[in-house]
């Protein structure tokens, strides 16, 4: 059975073969455009999750003694329906909220948004994609009028002379994608911007800028790092820029300054295909490389070198092409949208977007991070990437759903605000008085581990009148629930996903789900029936997709020319899948967007002026170091799946904190010691690992674990004012050696 990996947005092709062994299927890679026969460790071991030792196989209800106990589906769903009716009767429709996930199929994401807006009629629905792609989406929509992570096939990168990769560690998070960088590396054109010398940064063949930087004294006033003298080395395969955390925007402003000041911009392209260039000149003029160096720590000559390298690769200067790509490292910031906008401004100045062989793109992370934000589980959207406050969009979708447009709620709270507002803590007696949702339905998300300021989120979840979680395993969030509903996962279900390239692909069922596991489509249909909704909720994924296609017709993300049958036929004929928009059954799809015009009313891309503000929680005397969070190769997102795979868990079984050896000596934190990290949100502990891959003013922790080493317990929930994305990637921290047990008084 040909299908796709359950993890990241590469959606690597794989073949599943049923087996009588301990696992229900064997996994083999297949030749697909994104992975070309490769799989990472997570993909190779993905069958193990199908038979996780603690796989949920029956509904669970919280009993009077406080324990979760097995229940029948009727009892569990009756409890959910009764709880919803009670909360809405007492506190209003918006007192019930829904939280979705970027791993849900397109069909599930669509049905979840439809359920929230037609059955619950609540405005309060959002999803964990707000933690992943919101800033990139906001920037792309503002500039291009459309948001498709990569508006070109990933394979196009191979022909470029330069790729600027900001805040993405592809070599660990998406290993099969690295093969697409082989060509640009051979030409010395890979530029990686990352405060760490990550596995991806190491592909450039150079150490970065961190050598020689000043190490802050614990308890003293912080100082900006001093860059290494001179331009520093340039690797044989590219350049690694290692800025101060939270200053990626300064790097981009300086690069654009050089492009403008040295006459390297594509003037004809700017005149013919863009607007706003004059508005951008003023803020960019203030960021000459020497000034930028004092803030971002990257030597001025290296900034000039990279700007000239990108310009030389651009078509206007006779190059084979260049790409500017952003990832979570620069987007998960209180100025994430501004940083993405600066990256787009740079790409537009060089004449890259809308040209074959060049462009701007965002590296989508979650498996259906693209499709998951297109069809209705986002707080401000309707299917087809329509705006929920657009009267024409509301009328179109309402006709498909068979409801009055006036009954569709307006925009709801974005994820951080929604999670911050949960629980019966207000002083008023109605939802209108205190504004706090009292019930939450969670699908495909583990917010206890993945949300910022997670201790506060956990406390808010505990304060709910009703928490319902649909999950595969007893995740940390599921363990807090009043009702837990076991659901199907990737190899047990039919559906579609949309990859980081906007390629719509089929997910196929290879095995039956164990026990009493059900699909979310069935669960939503049963709840709609119990709640007395006249709106139809089909349970056949192919039928749901056909409805999604009708609802998306005419939207930015138009799937109306697609069906399960067409996707199956395309694959059977050796096709690679179809990229949206696909507005008709005979439309070939659009692998490359914007070649003729951008999706704005006048067809021109917008350059938007932005400027650097800095992190919301910057270093200070009592927290003189930067804390940066990220991922490791062996784990995925909150770790709820990968921590249950022995082959992966054995390699990285616990959280750790990386720090520079010089910093470790200064702080008295040895390699292998337990380190204590304290921010304004709280304190955590983890094993210290010395490495010169991090800056001496920075510590790094992956976020895949719960408990005392769960780094999101101490990250800030400050959010980007445009996108609502939280600032996971930088906050101020104090680091000390944790006292050994025998050292604790008493």
Which residues fall in each region the model found?
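Short beta-alpha connecting loops at secondary-structure transitions
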Residues: 236-243, 488, 492, 502-514, ...
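Long, contiguous, secondary-structure-rich segments that constitute the structural scaffold
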Residues: 514-516, 520-572, 638, 643-658, ...
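Flexible glycine/proline-enriched surface loops and loop-helix/loop-strand junctions
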Residues: 163, 234-237, 287-291, 325-330, ...
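N-terminal leader/propeptide and maturation segments of large enzyme subunits in energy/redox metabolism
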Residues: 67, 257, 262-300, 383-399, ...
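N-terminal export/assembly segments and adjacent metallocofactor-ligating motifs
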Residues: 1-262, 299, 404, 443, ...
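Glycine-rich phosphate/diphosphate-binding loops that line cofactor/substrate pockets in enzymes
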Residues: 76-96, 153-161, 184, 283, ...
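Extended redox/cofactor-interaction regions of prokaryotic respiratory oxidoreductases
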Residues: 110-230, 249-253, 344-479, 488-496, ...
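Flexible, glycine/charged-enriched surface loops at secondary-structure junctions
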Residues: 92-95, 265-270, 317-323, 354-363, ...
